[in-house]
Structures are given as structure tokens and as C-alpha cells.
Amino acid sequence: MRLFIIGNGFDRAHNLPTSYWDFRTHLETHYPDFLAAFEQHYYIVPNDSEEFKKNLLWNDFETNLANIDEDIIIEDALGVEMGLESGDVGIEDTLRIHFRSEYQYISKLAVYLKQWVKTIPLAATRPITSQISNNNKDIFITFNYTSVLEDTYQIDPEKVLHIHGSLREYDDDPILGHGNRNRIEDIKAKRNEAIIWSDEKKVSICRVIEEYYNTTFKNVANYMHKLSSLYKYRPQEIIVIGHSVAGIDLPYYKRINDLTNRKALWKVYYFDKTKEDCMRQSLIEQGISHKRIQMVDCAEFYDLT
């Protein structure tokens, strides 16, 4: 039995528009005012180049969700006049309401993300690899929201785990978020310092930014329980395709390695030759022995193109 770990590169290899830049295009078409306001908090303006927007935010969208410039936000917010007759006395509740409305983008992002996933066209998608077949007993963990495995390859949905949600009725809705816990701890420290100095206005601003970080935080520990069924399958081979083996998803690899008794062979397909060593090292850092890792060009995987 084999376990496939599948990332967004798999969908993109099928020529599906599933990058976060494609998500931005959806927002630009249907929610331009929201997009402009959202990007403004990352100091992106409409006239900026596509390359600049991609590098600053969209190329690594989930990681960059936490990269708002909180110092500038705090400085700007401290200068906001709320028009209260009592000055700054009792201003905290008013400020929290004000800035919550300013920074509650993530709830809308989640709604728009689900809408976008529904628009991704799968009808014309055809198989491009012979390695995935519904005749095998293989099981699948996918980081993708789409149903390419189920629809294009006719894989039994019971064999497919959408670790971060999908459009299936019994799954979580699509989930996105950053993994930068340090930003949360840093803003807590600033809030506590403001409490010491009785700076009610700054306390309120820090709390709202902290809420934003917490709301946009994807705590992978909350989804680890979904992997528990691996213990009974005990795959002999684990195949990674279309995933960068990096970022906030790395803890899953350690957990998968542990649940398979650290015995399975790992065949990892890379798209970019220059990332091969980095991907291998990431796996080693998760406790996977280099002797059990085989790196392969993904062109060998897509043998029906």
C-alpha cells in the first residue's frame, strides 16, 4: 500500500488555475473594493507592478498573512481621533469596535475562498499520470481544496483526506492561514507593555491586531487528529507530489513519519531542481532518515502528458 501526499503543484500540473494569484484575480473581478482595502494593509496600491504584488504577498500568501506592518498600524491608529467628548477616557471599547471593522478581513477571505474554489473548472481535466489509479489500495492526503482525485481519477472519497478542508459536505470548509506564532507573542508583549503604562488606546489597538493574527493563524495541531487513521494502514511507500515540503505544513510530515513507524520509503517528486536539496533537508529535520528518501524529477510522475 502507498500513501500519496499531494500539494497544489498537482492541480497546477493539470492546468487548473489554483494559485493564490488566481484567487487574487477572482477577488479583483468580483470584489475589487475588498481587494484594494485588503492589499492596502500590506502597503500594496493598485498601480504597483504584478511582480511586486506577488513577491510582497501573493506568491506565499498564507505565510505573508501575518506580515502586516504593525508598528505603522499602531502609530497611525494612535493618531485617529474618535470624536469622543470624554477624550481618551473609556475609549477602549469604541476603538475595538472601530478597528475590528477595519481588520476583520479574514472572515471575508474564507467566504471568498470557498466561492473561488467552486469556480475552478474540473470538467475538462484529464489524468496525466498512470501512478494514480482507482484499482489500487492506495490512500491519499491532499492539501488541495479541489476534487481532482475524486472526479478525474475516480478515487473513492473514503480514501482521500483533505487535510485543510474541501467543498465536500462532510469536510471542513477550505482553511487558510499563517503559522507565525512569533507575531502573536510579539504583539502580546506590546499590549502588556501598554497595560503597564495605562495606555488604553494602544492596548485596544494591540488587542485588535492580536485578534487579527489569531484569526489568520492556522494551527496545524488542530488538524493532526485527522491523520490518526494512518496507524492502521501502515503504508510501505509514501509518495509526495506537488508539495514544496516547506512552511507551516512541515509538522504533518513528522507526524506521518511517526504514525508509519518510521519505516516507509519516501519518494519525493520535485518541480524545481534547485529546491531538491532543501526539500530533502526539510524531511530529514522532521526525523526522516536520508536513507529512506528518494528525490525524483516530477516529469517522471506525469507520464501521460
Q: Can you say where each PLM-predicted feature lies in the sequence?
A:
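SIR2/sirtuin-family catalytic core signature
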Residues: M1-H14, F23, M224-T305
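Extended charged low-complexity segments that act as oligomerization/scaffolding linkers
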Residues: S19-N59, Y212-N219, G287-T305
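Conserved catalytic core of sirtuin-type NAD+-dependent deacylases
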Residues: I5-Y42, K137-T142, Q154-L161, L167-Y170, ...
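Acidic/glycine-enriched edge-of-secondary-structure segments
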Residues: I195-A221, K232-A246
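Extended, H/D-rich, highly charged conserved domains that either
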Residues: A37-V208
